[in-house]
């Protein structure tokens, strides 16, 4: 996509940055000769990739193409009309530029909007937009963006520092006078308040108060200071109802203003943000905004080049390299710096605090989305930043009483479900972060997991925890509501993962007692496994599963009752810490292969069909499940198919990027690795996309990946063998220590599947089954009517949950004279299942009424008791 023009622009930029070499080496493919490592990775980032609209299921991808630094406070980027995340490449109408952005799924950010224009002001400038040119004049590279407005002739260029956006705007000489709109009351989620102050003839300051993310109650206020390179000759304000020429200030939820300049002006506009105060924004501007536009642009490019150089790749065509480095770039945009240059920031308690010198306080954690693949990547590449991220969350908890869920600015939105901040923290820690308050971090995890985690303004980190601990699962009650539907099943699955992460973290700190408790709790997902249907299903507080099949097709809406953004088939596979236990529950390897083959027949279906939704987070790890069941060649094939959903185009992603979640998935998949088990450093493998790759570890060591034949016209798609530090390995996963010590991985590849390598049971990645129940039970019809003197039967469905358990017994107990049922015993079938018929006899002497029978099913060292209600009534003739 405009690659030649993009590379020319980058060549000029890199020369200014001091990064230019005598010539820019193109990326050779394997058939060009020996693959050469990419020398300048910023040359291969195109920020317009993934900024458009995908297919019907994909919808808006919601990436922004504008200027930012790694993990910066500012994301200075264009906006298009009626796009809730800011920008859509397929939309030709632009409202200008704003200072904050993220690839979110609800209206958010877009704070402090500005529009350079020559169109006369008119009576409603707060609604103004201009046509934007999505052609070869629109260029986006790390730290720089430029675009043309064909209707007015204005050319805009943007660059950024951590807390400042710098714009250069060229107005046409032969045209209307230059105008510059500033809209503090135009945040994408709307504004509860906004101010604007024209302080002198080169300075505008103000604030925007926004929030209400996805209908939640969060609020934040961001302040700004804006400095123009030349005095303006006219000015005014508006309030969303009228325009006030000559007015210096405005205080309205629709606040805005304008300033005017002569035709042909070339303006540099520097805008700094602060979440503390206008004075904080001024100080940030003074500290970061003094250099020339070109010098800032070059420095930002250098910063990005250093960050992206943590991973070097060689081989493959330019399109794949561009996709890879653009995805790596997007993996380093969030979370965001939240403190000013002097260290001050607004806390969750509404009080101004200061972060320790040399550290950064971060905000904006889309935890449910990012803990799976983004947190491991950031922890591996940037452990010191990752440490500050964890400490920021720990500090948030200390200020508010609990960890936030989907933290935006300085408050918890409560968006999504689960307690996903826990595996986010533990993944960052496992992959390298160490410099934070470990004791306090564990304390707040355990507090929420046992007491609920009471935060501010009614926020609960784990709502419904008392019922969860009493029942061993999240029931279908209001406390387990998520995104408009009650999601007890998916919450239970998430909390099982969360508790496993707590167990691993506690164990690493030497707290073996806590580790054991939460390891046992990590198996609570088994309490929702319905042996009648073979699904992990929602369950009532009384213990009943829904009637009918486990998967229910919904022709509309956003998923199935009991599940957050998905359905029973999609969530079935989310037991990453005990895949072996799930395989046993589903009847063993052969049965699971058939089911997984059917599930991956389609790759990106959305929340309502019983197939993989590759663009949504619960399905991220599915392609690697074949590594657990003896068919790793299908992992290699499926990962390759999903990678094909990405590409170097505006529509080149299978879903909403969710603050780098989807992009980080691609980075791992392209390297041939995936962090399969949250809370651990287990990396399971697939065929790499590049002939060579090097992951530079901060310790000075590296992970070297060699896969001859991965690139080229006739690329080899299947793993034929693997050596780790020159030792042959038949395992489909790497030693956990490799993320610390580094190592050399050499993949031997082939054009056809090797159906021997990696197929042994010992080759599967580890599962953590301690605390598992040996059996799960359901009685689909627990109410039975029997007339006196007759016998009825109920069916007990049971499923073995641990391999090696062969025998079961069913013991019905009645405490009513005249009602009897005989015990029975037997062996599970080859799939570990049984449907046992229990005969219940009612004597003629038993009066009409309701009588419970307690049916206990035992296997191994586990026993589960369910109640059958016998309704005795005389027959009606």
Curated annotation (Swiss-Prot):
Residues 1-32 form the signal peptide. NCBIfam families: aman2_put (TIGR01180). Its EC number is 3.2.1.-. Gene3D superfamilies: 2.70.98.10, alpha-1,2-mannosidase (1.20.1050.60), alpha-1,2-mannosidases domains (1.20.1610.10), GH92 mannosidase domain (3.30.2080.10). PROSITE patterns: NITROGENASE_1_1. Belongs to the glycosyl hydrolase 92 family. One of its GO terms (biological process) is glycoprotein catabolic process. It holds the Pfam family Glyco_hydro_92. The keyword Transmembrane helix does not apply. The keyword DNA damage does not apply. It comes from the Bacteria. Keywords: Glycosidase, Hydrolase, Signal. GO terms for molecular function: carbohydrate binding; hydrolase activity, acting on glycosyl bonds; peptide-N4-(N-acetyl-beta-glucosaminyl)asparagine amidase activity. GO terms for cellular component: cytosol. This is Uncharacterized glycosidase Rv0584.
């Amino acid at each position: 996509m405009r690659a030649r023009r993009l590379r020319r622009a980058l060549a000029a930029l890199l020369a200014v940055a001091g990064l230019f070499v005598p010539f820019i080496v193109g990326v050779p493919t394997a058939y060009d000769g020996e693959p050469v490592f990419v020398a300048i990775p910023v040359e291969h980032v195109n920020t317009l990739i993934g900024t458009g609209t995908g297919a019907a299921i994909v919808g808006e991808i919601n990436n922004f193409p504008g200027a930012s630094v790694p993990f910066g406070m500012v994301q200075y980027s264009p906006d298009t009309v009626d796009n809730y995340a800011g920008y859509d490449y397929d939309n030709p109408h632009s409202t200008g530029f704003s200072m904050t952005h993220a690839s979110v799924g609800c209206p958010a950010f877009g704070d402090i909007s500005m529009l350079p224009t020559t169109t006369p002001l008119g009576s409603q400038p707060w609604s103004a937009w201009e046509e934007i040119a999505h052609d070869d004049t629109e260029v986006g590279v790390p730290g720089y963006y430029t675009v043309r407005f064909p209707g007015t002739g204005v050319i805009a260029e943007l660059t950024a520092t951590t807390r400042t956006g710098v714009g250069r705007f060229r107005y046409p000489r032969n045209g209307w006078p230059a105008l510059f709109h500033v809209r503090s009351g135009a945040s994408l989620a709307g504004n509860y308040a906004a101010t604007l102050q024209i302080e002198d003839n080169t300075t505008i300051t103000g604030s925007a108060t926004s929030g209400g993310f996805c209908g939640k109650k969060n609020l934040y206020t961001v302040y700004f200071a804006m400095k123009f390179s030349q005095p303006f000759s006219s000015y005014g304000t508006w309030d969303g109802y009228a325009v006030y020429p000559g007015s210096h200030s405005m205080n309205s939820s629709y606040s805005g203003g304008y300033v005017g300049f002569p035709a042909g002006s070339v303006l540099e506009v520097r805008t700094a943000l602060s979440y503390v105060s206008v004075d904080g924004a001024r100080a940030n501007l003074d500290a970061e905004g003094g250099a020339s536009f070109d010098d800032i642009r070059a420095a930002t490019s250098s910063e990005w080049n250093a960050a992206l150089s943590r991973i070097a790749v060689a081989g493959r065509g330019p399109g794949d390299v561009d996709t890879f480095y653009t995805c790596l770039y997007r993996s380093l945009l969030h979370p965001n710096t939240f403190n000013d240059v002097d260290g001050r920031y607004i806390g969750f308690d509404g009080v101004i605090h200061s972060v320790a010198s040399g550290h950064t306080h971060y905000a904006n954690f889309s935890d449910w989305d990012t803990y799976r693949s983004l947190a491991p990547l950031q922890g591996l590449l940037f452990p010191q930043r990752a440490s500050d991220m964890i400490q920021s969350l720990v500090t948030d908890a200390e200020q508010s009483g609990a960890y936030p869920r989907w933290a935006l600015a300085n408050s918890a939105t409560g968006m999504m479900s689960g307690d996903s901040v826990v595996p986010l923290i533990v993944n960052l820690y496992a992959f390298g972060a160490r410099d934070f308050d470990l004791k306090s971090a564990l304390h707040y995890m355990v507090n929420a997991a046992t007491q609920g985690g009471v935060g501010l303004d009614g926020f609960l980190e784990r709502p419904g925890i008392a019922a969860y601990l009493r029942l061993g699962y999240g029931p279908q009650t209001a406390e387990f509501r998520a995104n408009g539907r009650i999601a007890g099943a998916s919450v239970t699955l998430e909390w099982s993962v969360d508790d496993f992460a707590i167990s691993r973290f506690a164990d690493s700190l030497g707290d073996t007692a806590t580790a054991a408790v939460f390891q046992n709790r990590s198996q609570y997902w088994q309490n929702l496994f319905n042996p009648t249907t073979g699904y992990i299903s929602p369950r009532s507080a009384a213990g009943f599963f829904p009637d009918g099949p486990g998967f229910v097709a919904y022709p509309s809406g956003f998923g199935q009752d009991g599940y957050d953004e998905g359905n029973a088939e999609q969530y079935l596979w989310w037991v990453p810490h005990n895949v072996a236990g799930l395989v046993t529950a589903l009847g063993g390897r052969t049965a699971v292969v058939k089911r997984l083959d059917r599930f991956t027949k389609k790759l990106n279906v959305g929340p309502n069909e019983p197939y993989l939704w590759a663009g949504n987070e619960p399905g991220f790890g599915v392609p690697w499940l074949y590594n657990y069941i003896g068919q790793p060649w299908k992992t290699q094939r499926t990962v390759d198919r999903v990678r094909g959903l990405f590409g170097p185009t505006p529509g080149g992603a299978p879903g909403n990027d969710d603050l780098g979640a989807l992009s980080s998935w691609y980075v791992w998949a392209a390297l041939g690795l995936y962090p399969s088990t949250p809370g651990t450093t287990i990396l399971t493998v697939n065929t790499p996309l590049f002939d060579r790759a090097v992951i530079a570890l901060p310790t000075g060591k590296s992970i070297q990946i060699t896969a001859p034949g991965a690139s080229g016209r006739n690329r080899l798609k299947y793993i034929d063998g693997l050596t780790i530090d020159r030792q042959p390995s038949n395992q489909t996963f790497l030693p956990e220590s490799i993320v610390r010590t580094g190592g050399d991985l050499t993949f031997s590849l082939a054009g056809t599947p090797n159906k021997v390598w990696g197929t042994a049971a010992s080759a599967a990645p580890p599962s953590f089954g301690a605390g598992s129940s040996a059996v799960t039970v359901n009685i689909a019809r627990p109410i039975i009517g029997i007339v006196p003197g007759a016998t009825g039967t109920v069916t007990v469905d049971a499923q073995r949950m641990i391999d090696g358990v062969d025998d079961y017994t069913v013991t019905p107990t009645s405490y009513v004279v005249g009602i009897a049922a005989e015990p029975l015993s037997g062996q599970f079938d080859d799939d570990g299942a049984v449907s046992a018929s229990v005969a219940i006899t009612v004597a003629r002497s038993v009066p009409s009424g309701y009588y419970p029978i307690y049916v206990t099913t035992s296997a191994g060292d586990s026993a589960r008791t369910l109640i059958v209600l016998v309704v005795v009534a005389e027959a009606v003739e």
